[in-house]
Amino acid sequence: MKVGSKELEASKVRVIVDKDPVATSFEKWAQPGHFSRTLAKGPKTTTWIWNLHADAHDFDSQTSSLEDISRKIFSAHFGQLAIIFLWVSQAYFHGARFSNYSAWLLNPTSIKPSAQVVWPVVGQEILNGDVGGGFSGVQITSGVFQMWRASGITNETELYWTAMGGLMMSALMVFAGWFHYHKAAPKLEWFQNVESMMNHHLAGLLGLGCLSWSGHQIHISLPINKLLDAGVAPQEIPLPHELLFNQDLMAQLYPSFKKGLLPFFTLNWGEYSDFLTFKGGLNPITGSLWLSDTAHHHLALAVLFIFAGHMYRTNWGIGHSMKEILEAHKGPLTGEGHKGLYEILTTSWHAQLAINLAMMGSLSIIVAHHMYAMPPYPYIAVDYPTQLSLFTHHMWIGGFCVCGAAAHGAIFMVRDYSPVQSYNNLLDRVLRHRDAIISHLNWVCIFLGTHSFGLYIHNDTMRALGRPQDMFSDKAIQLQPIFAKWVQSLHTLAPGNTAPNSLATASYAFGGDVVAVNGKIAMMPIQLGTADFLVHHIHAFTIHVTVLILLKGVLFARSSRLIPDKANLGFRFPCDGPGRGGTCQVSAWDHIFLGLFWMYNCISVVIFHFSWKMQSDVWGTISEKGKITHITGGNFANSALTINGWLRDFLWSQASQVIQSYGSALSAYGIIFLGAHFIWAFSLMFLFSGRGYWQELIESVVWAHNKLKLAPAIQPRALSITQGRAVGLAHYLLGGIGTTWSFFLARIISVG
């Protein structure tokens, strides 16, 4: 039989999915714990419900097939995307249905954004404050109005249709999650094809994502924002499709549109500089980055990422191989280098996740700092509550992601790490000198803690004794942050040399002019002094302690001098028996548990520093004659020198708004402030708990029930040590975040 060329082609095509691998059935939904033999038997004691929650998403414990685990994670990602689209959709829907967006668009400096109206039940309509323009609602601080203005949305109808689009995408994601698990599930080799994944993610997700956003900015956002900035009423602005297809209309705003694509193909790209700019600084009308700069930025990124998406070797014999890159990565002092990492990263999703969480966490923290230094959306810089909320939000997200990175790094060490596979590579070498790493980190923490705290204690003592001349301050013994000031001056002067065509510095935080919108300061040079030097070293201290705890958890996850067989005990275990000088709280899980408290300390100091510094030295008003008045009148430099100053002039002084909020539109923050304190205090009951005490108490309560012939069928058990810690930690963080949130918002909405 002769095989035709088509048949030959067909035989070459690899099948990378399994058809109908898992039947669709709702019967399992009715069997709690169906994924585990032990749990499927049903509850004998109250511990069952805890284990059910702990293990429901722990796919590793449900099957040993990496392919099945990969499919479950892949499918769950579609579920996650469905929820994200639903969440985005509701944000747009509230903007369309319950907001004062149109009024805000006409007067963004004196009308406050609101997209939430409370129903008149039990008198809670008091929360609908007067936000201006005859609208009553809850003032929102998410920055969505500013983002919608930047993307060229001019009315509520457009928001409504975008919300519908989000809803449809959400439904599509639910379908995709079902389809790729039950109908056409990818094989393991598809998940492990990293070169193809890198190419598609870089060129597709990032490259085409940036390109399409850049295209949207150029064709829709830029013309609409130019007209809005010129004072044209939103209802008179052409609709997006008119701008897209009517070249003459665009040419009136950006003359280079007349020339079409000719300059592009003749390489006269400079012709397009009317809408692809490199100005630097901020737009004085909106107090935000120039939209033509950000369009240019996204276009450049798109080119970069599309190039990057053609780097890896797939079907044609050109490009990089990830395995070869990693194995070639050797130095004279690093043994086998990165040999073995390819195998780790293609078989351990925990290792992948750990790296991605560390990167995303760091990125979120970088975003937090860029959001105020280089405000991206129109009028966002003069909306102080939004600026404070977004900074705080991105710092918290970053902190949680970094702790998650350590958690999954440790799970990888316990469940997926193979010492044989990693002989003498960098990972192995790090593990072998972990004692040196951890003891050095410990020394750094002791040094930073003693000295940074010591400077404050000195200042408190001197101020208490009435000896201000002996304090560390800008007026007495100066500890100026000379390196930070040098970096500031460098950035202020740099554009003249490195980007001669730009009009201003990248950020006015470094130096330059005061940018104000309608007399309200958007950004200005941030002066640094002794008070910043002191709190900076507290930041260094808390970051290093967090890293010490998390890194120790990862490096000692498998074994330690105290417990050499830790890997056999698993990721979380309460203790390993008595008699060795304490073996409780040594599991990798416990390190994450302890690390999260220090992360909380760390982020709290950062957001307190930011909140006070901005109110003291940046946010405020500027008169026509140029006189600047800050919200707290520049008191940071003198008050933040002592612990007493932080307590008195920041925490206590600025808490007056939240404490006195009852009976006003801010009263919800007053109640949350109180309730979150209670939740925080409730956590201590679990954190200082004695398990035996509770078990003993439960026995008495059960005895009483038995006496009354009311014996429960499910035997009550005290929480295990680990469960108690988990409950305590959750309430500690929830209470702490709720307290901070209500304190910040009541304060800044009142004075901002």
Curated annotation (Swiss-Prot):
SUPFAM superfamilies linked: Photosystem I subunits PsaA/PsaB (SSF81558)
GO cellular component: chloroplast thylakoid membrane; photosystem I
Annotated phylloquinone binding sites: 694
Residues where chlorophyll a' binds: 677
Segments crossing the lipid bilayer: 73-96, 159-182, 198-222, 294-312, 349-372, 388-414, 436-458, 533-551, 591-612, 666-688, 726-746
Residues that hold [4Fe-4S] cluster according to the record: 575, 584
Gene Ontology annotations of biological process type: photosynthesis
EC number assigned by the record: 1.97.1.12
Pfam families named among the record's database cross-references: PsaA_PsaB
Reactions mediated catalytically: reduced [plastocyanin] + hnu + oxidized [2Fe-2S]-[ferredoxin] = oxidized [plastocyanin] + reduced [2Fe-2S]-[ferredoxin]
Keyword presence, Repeat: no
Record-stated family: Belongs to the PsaA/PsaB family.
HAMAP family recorded: PSI_PsaA
Function: PsaA and PsaB bind P700, the primary electron donor of photosystem I (PSI), as well as the electron acceptors A0, A1 and FX. PSI is a plastocyanin/cytochrome c6-ferredoxin oxidoreductase, converting photonic excitation into a charge separation, which transfers an electron from the donor P700 chlorophyll pair to the spectroscopically characterized acceptors A0, A1, FX, FA and FB in turn. Oxidized P700 is reduced on the lumenal side of the thylakoid membrane by plastocyanin or cytochrome c6.
Assembly and binders: The PsaA/B heterodimer binds the P700 chlorophyll special pair and subsequent electron acceptors. PSI consists of a core antenna complex that captures photons, and an electron transfer chain that converts photonic excitation into a charge separation. The eukaryotic PSI reaction center is composed of at least 11 subunits.
Protein name, entry field: Photosystem I P700 chlorophyll a apoprotein A1
